[in-house]
Amino acid sequence: MSRIGNRILTIPAGVEVSVASDNTVTVKGSKGTLTQKFAEVITIKVEGAELSTTRANEIKHTKQLHGTTNSLLQGMLIGVSEGFKKTLDINGVGYRAALAGSKLNLSLGYSHPVEYTIPQGITVECPKPTQIIISGIDKQVVGQVAAEIRSYRRPEPYKGKGIKYSDEIIIRKEGKAAGK
C-alpha cells in the first residue's frame, strides 16, 4: 500500500495556508490563490511551515482519499509558488498555431481553422508557430487545457503528424509493404 498520505509537506517561503472548519483549504502565494474543499474523513493540520494530513479510519476508500488529498495539497503548494507548464509541439505541413487575444487559432489540415477559447487563469504563448506553451497555477486545469488542444489532432503513428506533448515519444509504424 502506498504511503503518500503520510508525507509531511513543507510550505514554501511566501506561501500562506489556511484551513476552514469545513475542510476547505486556501493556499495563497506569489502567483495567486487556490481554494479546494476536501473530504471530512481527512484532517488537515498546519503546524509552522509544515502541512500534514491524517485519516479518521482504516477503510480502503479513506486510505485512497488520504493519498489523493496529500498529492492535491502538494500540487496547490507548488502551483502558487512556482506554477505549472506544459509544452505542445505541432508537426505537419501547414499545421500552425497563432494567438488572437483570448483565443488560440489552430490550422490543423481541416477545411476550417480550429478556434480554442483559453480559460481564465491560464496563460498560453506561441513562441513559434509550431509550439504552444500552456502555464498556470492549477495543475489540473493546465493539464486539461493541454489535453483538449492535443485532442484536436492527435499524433498519428505513420508520419508523426499532429499535436504532441514536447516530452512525448510517438511510436512509429512502418507503412504497407508493396506486394509483387
From Swiss-Prot:
Regions that span the bilayer: none
Example of a GO MF term: rRNA binding
Pfam families found in the cross-reference section: Ribosomal_L6
Keyword Ribonucleoprotein: yes
Record SUPFAM superfamilies: Ribosomal protein L6
Keywords from the UniProt entry: Ribonucleoprotein, Ribosomal protein, RNA-binding, rRNA-binding
InterPro entries: Ribosomal_uL6-like, Ribosomal_uL6-like_a/b-dom_sf, Ribosomal_uL6_a/b-dom, Ribosomal_uL6_bac-type, Ribosomal_uL6_CS
Domain of life, source organism: Bacteria
GO BP of this protein: cytoplasmic translation
One Gene Ontology cellular component annotation held by this UniProt entry: cytosolic large ribosomal subunit
Known role: This protein binds to the 23S rRNA, and is important in its secondary structure. It is located near the subunit interface in the base of the L7/L12 stalk, and near the tRNA binding site of the peptidyltransferase center.
NCBIfam families: L6_bact
Subunit structure: Part of the 50S ribosomal subunit.
Similarity field: Belongs to the universal ribosomal protein uL6 family.
Protein's name according to its UniProt entry: Large ribosomal subunit protein uL6
Organism: Mesoplasma florum (strain ATCC 33453 / NBRC 100688 / NCTC 11704 / L1) (Acholeplasma florum)
Gene this protein is translated from: rplF
